[in-house]
C-alpha cells in the first residue's frame, strides 16, 4: 500500500513538472 502511494505521488509530481515545462515552452 505504502509503495503504491509513493509511486502514484511520484507520477503526479512528474506530470506537474512536465506541464510546467510545456507551459514555459508555450510562453
UniProtKB/Swiss-Prot annotation:
Q: Does the keyword Chaperone apply?
A: no
What does the entry say induces or represses the expression of this protein? Repressed by LexA, induced by DNA damage.
Chief place of localization: membrane
Gene Ontology cellular-component annotations: membrane; plasma membrane
Task: Specify the protein's topology with respect to the membrane.
Answer: Single-pass membrane protein
Name where it's found. Answer: Cell inner membrane
Name a single GO biological process: DNA damage response
Keywords, A to Z? Cell inner membrane, Cell membrane, Membrane, Transmembrane, Transmembrane helix
Q: Where are the transmembrane segments?
A: 6-26
Keyword Cell inner membrane, does the record have it?
yes
InterPro entries from the entry? DinQ-like
Which family, according to the similarity comment? Belongs to the DinQ family.
What is the protein name given in its UniProt record?
Answer: Uncharacterized protein DinQ
Write the gene name. Answer: dinQ
Amino acid at each position: 500500500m505504502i509503495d503504491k502511494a509513493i509511486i502514484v505521488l511520484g507520477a503526479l509530481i512528474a506530470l506537474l513538472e512536465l506541464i510546467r515545462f510545456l507551459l514555459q515552452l508555450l510562453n
